[in-house]
Amino acid sequence: MKIRLDQYLCQNGYAQSRERAKALIMSGIVFVNEQKVDKAGEMIAEDAKVEVRGHDIGYVSRGGLKLEKAMQVFPMRPDGKVCMDIGASTGGFTDCMLTNGAVKVYAVDVGYGQLAWSLRTDERVVNMERTNIRNVTPDMLGDKIAFFSVDVSFISLKHIFPVADTICTPDAVGVCLVKPQFEAGREKVGKKGVVREPATHTEVLHMAQGYAMANHFTPAGLDFSPIKGPEGNIEFLMYVQHSQNPQPLPEGLIEQTVANAHAALDKAPNLH
């Protein structure tokens, strides 16, 4: 099965429109199986290795595209706010926050030396590397957090929400990447750490909703990430609002979102 290169870029989150995809291809930064391809209509195998080299996606990493989608579908903006990027890595989410008006971003990650140099040297960024979010307390910060994102691996959201509850403003909002491979029981995770069953995705999202509500967050929106994980995992974006009276998502929304995700992404190639 083959697919047009520009269509592939759109489906996998490299570009937000066909025109943007064509521009990337024509600029000479798109490589298929290590070979530069400059024709948007080039037909490629669905399992081909596709790379967009350079920062022409607009952010230091493709992670920024996940937050970009969240801001398109949920009523959340970082303009003028103190923000936190939990699981910052190279800083795609941080970059997206700054691009959209954040006044300060605390970039938190257990790793070291990963944050892009352009962000490391930006006076609006507080680089909290070598920091486990589970150990962060309000007195470690100079501010309350009004806008946050979560993109972490090998840790469940049940460990994130209790901390967010203590460091956020009363009206804070956030978007959490729900990764089934790190939430589901081991018996439900397949080869290479991939969760494929819609029933497991549904179960995980109900669990994530419970974690949020138990820590004073209302799950106020849900969608699927435009980018699959490296091994092909479908991941989800959950929009939350800090609240003393948390409410669940509308009935049936979790099931519908899972169905929409599988319809859109089951045949999409994995991200490389």
Task: Write out the residue ranges for each language-model feature.
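Conserved S-adenosyl-L-methionine
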Residues: 96-104
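A basic, amphipathic helix-loop patch mediating RNA/tRNA/ribosome contacts
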Residues: 1-48, 82-83
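A short glycine-rich, Lys/Arg-flanked "PGG" loop and its adjoining helix->strand segment in the class I
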Residues: 158-175
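Short, glycine-/aromatic-enriched active-site segment of Class I SAM-dependent methyltransferases
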Residues: 180-197
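S-adenosyl-L-methionine
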Residues: 106-159
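Conserved class I S-adenosyl-L-methionine
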Residues: 79-89
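Flexible, glycine-/basic-rich loop-and-beta segments that form/coincide
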Residues: 234-272
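Glycine-rich SAM-binding Motif I of class I
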Residues: 91-92, 113
